[in-house]
């Protein structure tokens, strides 16, 4: 029994440590695809990964490529900042870096005067947090951290940016 348990645990660990490849992405959901893109960056894997309004794209070290369609979802990567940012339209999980890493923010998303989302988020080691939003809509995004606030219009159309880096926090 102990040997079976050890073999099971070793097998599970090997599955988690599986090298990045298109096969790893087969059959996984959107949340897991996002988690893999972020994990591969944090582990220093040489995988180029980015998201457009239509899909996740991956380019692996061996030259193979993969695409995971977003369907009805739209993924917006957001990097609030105080002093330093970069221009961005398409979010590259493999290289985009925001200023405020591993920090917590209060987020509200409004459609007109109607609040459609209120949540707490934490930026990752890359300085970004991600929001899943319905497609083909216009919103106002509000981000707060203590008495620091930023607000910006965002859209989720097929030509909309997937990377928001111009969300400057100001004291209020």
Residue spans for each PLM region:
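A short, solvent-exposed beta-strand micro-motif common in secreted/extracellular proteins
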Residues: 137-146
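Short acidic/polar inter-strand loop motif in beta-rich domains
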Residues: 146-152
